């Protein structure tokens, strides 16, 4: 190409850098980067042309770790007398569309109850859709999460018990690439599932973590307005 177009001075090698989607992930990024550069260098040297500017499109690698989705488990149900299902408070189809569209798996961990006994479970979304799930058949070898219990929430600062129970929270991490873009925010989603609240977590100038609410959970009224039922 350089011989055909002498003005050509750059090459775009596209994407392809992997991102960590499981705890056993092991990938030598430096080795791969060195291989890319050395291969281009050797080809240029062999053909006696100058080294080009090298551009990449490592989208998932660049932004993937910047996103996470947190769900709470609404309850547990038994199916086929052997499958334990945890039902989450949202939908995988709407919040993690790649789990439904291409069977993508993500780094998943419980947020609390780490000290509880673990059991193999299947995760089901809130919709009636038969594809709204995250299980070993489709995404990973097996899903193990802490057992649910009846532990009440700790009393608030005023010491008055709430009587409510602490739910199990589970987090899906490294979701920063494509999930929000595909799902969108503020529109009408599958089965009228509202867009979840979005929280930004950052580090301030003193190195301390800070967070703020970027967007509230989508309200039923806003969805009705979009559909034209409310003026």
Which stretches of residues belong to each language-model region?
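N-terminal, helix-rich and Lys/Arg-enriched segments in bacterial and organellar proteins
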Residues: 13, 32-33
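Conserved "cap/hinge" positions at secondary-structure junctions
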Residues: 21-22, 174
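Conserved N-terminal phosphate-binding loop of PLP-dependent enzymes in the Aspartate aminotransferase
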Residues: 23, 28
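Contiguous mid-protein beta-loop-alpha structural module that forms a pocket-lining wall or clamp
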Residues: 18, 30, 53
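Glycine-rich beta-strand-to-loop/alpha-helix junction loops that act as flexible
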Residues: 11-21, 56-61
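Structured alpha-helical segments in the cores of large, soluble enzyme domains
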Residues: 1-9, 36-44
